[in-house]
């Protein structure tokens, strides 16, 4: 990059701007790498939701995959209640997944001084 001089002979560009751009590009690359690693780790992070006093329990991973659903034997005869509890449980586990994903992402963005990215 060619340095430009003002009327007073002071530099108007060049070195500092180039360094800032290189530093920013490096930081952006590191941030993307950390985010990719985090996305990959989400398959290992589990969250659990229990509804109906424990009658339905759902376990899912933060990559939004359901791993297990446990249903109390007493619900076998009450289809409507079972359906309502499954819906409530799925909604709750999805909310917990999103909250956990935001918490994990926040840890990374704080390292880079980028609050509120997620």
Swiss-Prot record:
It is found in: Cytoplasm, Nucleoid. Keywords: Cytoplasm, DNA-binding. Its main location: cytoplasm. GO terms for molecular function: DNA binding. The keyword Cytoplasm applies. SUPFAM superfamilies: YbaB-like. One of its GO terms (cellular component) is bacterial nucleoid. Pfam families: YbaB_DNA_bd. Belongs to the YbaB/EbfC family. Homodimer. Binds to DNA and alters its conformation. May be involved in regulation of gene expression, nucleoid organization and DNA protection. This is Nucleoid-associated protein Tpet_0244. It comes from Thermotoga petrophila (strain ATCC BAA-488 / DSM 13995 / JCM 10881 / RKU-1). The lineage of its organism: Bacteria, Thermotogati, Thermotogota, Thermotogae, Thermotogales.
């Amino acid at each position: 990059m060619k340095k430009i001089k003002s009327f007073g002979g002071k530099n108007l560009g060049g070195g500092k701007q180039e360094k800032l751009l290189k530093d920013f590009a490096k930081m952006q690359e590191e941030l993307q790498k950390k985010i990719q690693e985090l996305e990959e780790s989400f398959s290992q992070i589990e969250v659990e939701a229990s509804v109906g006093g424990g009658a339905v329990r759902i376990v899912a991973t933060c990559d939004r995959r359901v791993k297990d659903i446990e249903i109390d034997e007493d619900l076998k005869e009450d289809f409507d209640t079972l359906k309502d509890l499954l819906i409530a449980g799925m909604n709750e586990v999805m909310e917990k997944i999103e909250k956990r994903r935001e918490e994990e992402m926040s840890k990374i963005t704080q390292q880079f001084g980028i609050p509120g990215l997620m």
